[in-house]
């Protein structure tokens, strides 16, 4: 498995083409599985179930309609995006619910290293924080797609993005719960390096090499 880490913001259209090409390579056996860690300039993406009414302001940043699962979400600086391109068949994970559960687990284990108690919320994909009397907020979104059981797209974890940029959408189509970040929780993760190190360790522990 190859790990690719980009320090600078990546062009979104280029990233789609890169993922699609790597998926083809994994399917035909000419390329290795890949976990790609990156970030984008500010933009919005809409998944296959996105409702146009959830896009409240289409003029603020570029909007891309893509083939991943899910609705509208935001990407931008301070958010770590992770795209695992895995052969799920060879890993005996031919079950999207199981795959998403495992991705959530990787994020939960990673965030625990920073003192963030992430959890799942029944009926909603992603990783959430806040329990008891506190309304839960999403700290990590997940939207995936598979082609011949090779996965792509993936995870977006909010470390220190500008959360006001979410105001132009209804994130993931959920009106009753908000979004948060490590920074909003009072936890400074100013360098992606530490997050990446813990994420890789957690990912390998759960998915293997």
UniProtKB/Swiss-Prot annotation:
The Swiss-Prot or TrEMBL record annotates one GO molecular function as: lipoyl(octanoyl) transferase activity
Ranges for domain BPL/LPL catalytic come to: 29-209
Q: Name one GO cellular component term.
A: cytoplasm
Give the UniProt subcellular location, in the record's own words: Cytoplasm
Look up the signal peptide feature and give its range: none
What are the UniProt keywords, alphabetically? Answer: Acyltransferase, Cytoplasm, Transferase
| Protein EC | 2.3.1.181
Query: Which pathway is this protein assigned to?
Result: Protein modification; protein lipoylation via endogenous pathway; protein N(6)-(lipoyl)lysine from octanoyl-[acyl-carrier-protein]: step 1/2
Listed GO biological process terms: protein modification process
Q: Which PROSITE patterns match?
A: BPL_LPL_CATALYTIC, LIPB
User: What is the active site of this protein?
Assistant: 172
The enzyme's main class, written as a single word, is: transferase
Reactions catalysed, semicolon-separated, are:
octanoyl-[ACP] + L-lysyl-[protein] = N(6)-octanoyl-L-lysyl-[protein] + holo-[ACP] + H(+)
- Top-rank taxon of the source lineage equals Bacteria
Task: Show which residues form the site (Lowers pKa of active site Cys).
Answer: 138
Family in the record: Belongs to the LipB family.
Q: List other remarks.
A: In the reaction, the free carboxyl group of octanoic acid is attached via an amide linkage to the epsilon-amino group of a specific lysine residue of lipoyl domains of lipoate-dependent enzymes.
Primary role: Catalyzes the transfer of endogenously produced octanoic acid from octanoyl-acyl-carrier-protein onto the lipoyl domains of lipoate-dependent enzymes. Lipoyl-ACP can also act as a substrate although octanoyl-ACP is likely to be the physiological substrate.
From the Swiss-Prot or TrEMBL record, give the protein name: Octanoyltransferase
